[in-house]
Amino acid sequence: LIVIFYSYIEKLFTPIQNLAEQFNVLQSALAAGERIYDVLNIKSELEDAEDAIEIDHLDGEIEFKNVWFAYVGEDWILKDVSFKVKAKENVAFVGATGSGKTTILSLIVRNYDIQKGQIFIDGLDIKKYQIASLRKHIGQMLQDVFLFSGTVESNITLRSEEITSDIVKEACRFVNADKVIDKLPNKYNEIVRERGKNFSSGERQLISFARVVSHKPNIMILDEATSNIDTETEALIQDSLKKMMNIGTMLIVAHRLSTIQHCDKIIVLKKGKIIESGTHLELLDKRGHYYL
């Protein structure tokens, strides 16, 4: 009887103990949820002007005019930067870490507002465009590709109803992503694990290229997107980049010579200032900072 009694006592307390443990997990989840909502409810410092216009189409001409920018106070990251990018031109920005390359790209999508100067897209100050509308026409390809849990196709469409399966497949063929996807057991319905853990860095980058092309942006931004690619997909990525350079304005930050040498213009930055610009061959002939 004593053995049976202790056996029943154990069966009684085990569910209670499990419930107590789950309660701790629930409390942690509620606390995490509150922090997430706090972040989501942060109001953006950037707001549309009352007369901001919605964009139907961009040609892709970009101009920086005497731009000064600092993240904090007057610790200037960009100092009196001026340059012009023609529509459908391919321009690369090179320079040491901290020279302002990525900052320039962030300002074009208006992640921040500048302190001095002006930034124009298609001849109009970017502050006169609706922020969401502007970003809709700019495709970004970054070093760290974020893939969501879901199918390959949903990661390319980003749940947009305007992008059909045919558009997805066409975009994948264009950027050579189909050569990777067609080898998958379920092809476009293959499940992507969290953050794309079941794909190599190069494969994730090809999927991000297809994502951008399928949304048909007028301006494309490539920020160190070729820095961590694997050797197996490097040739596919370089070939897809050459194709993408012909469909819109492209701005590139990269350290790989193979990525930037075919650009129409290369802008060299040093400590927030433009020190020289030209084509790859022109800059080599100058034997300046780019040559070194």
Residue spans of the language-model regions?
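Short, conserved catalytic or interaction motifs in soluble domains
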Residues: 14, 28-31, 41, 131, ...
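Generic alpha-helical structural context detector
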Residues: 4, 21, 34-38, 169-173, ...
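Conserved catalytic core of two-component sensor histidine kinases
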Residues: 6, 13, 135
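Cytosolic ends of transmembrane helices, especially the final helix of ABC transmembrane type-1 domains
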Residues: 11-39
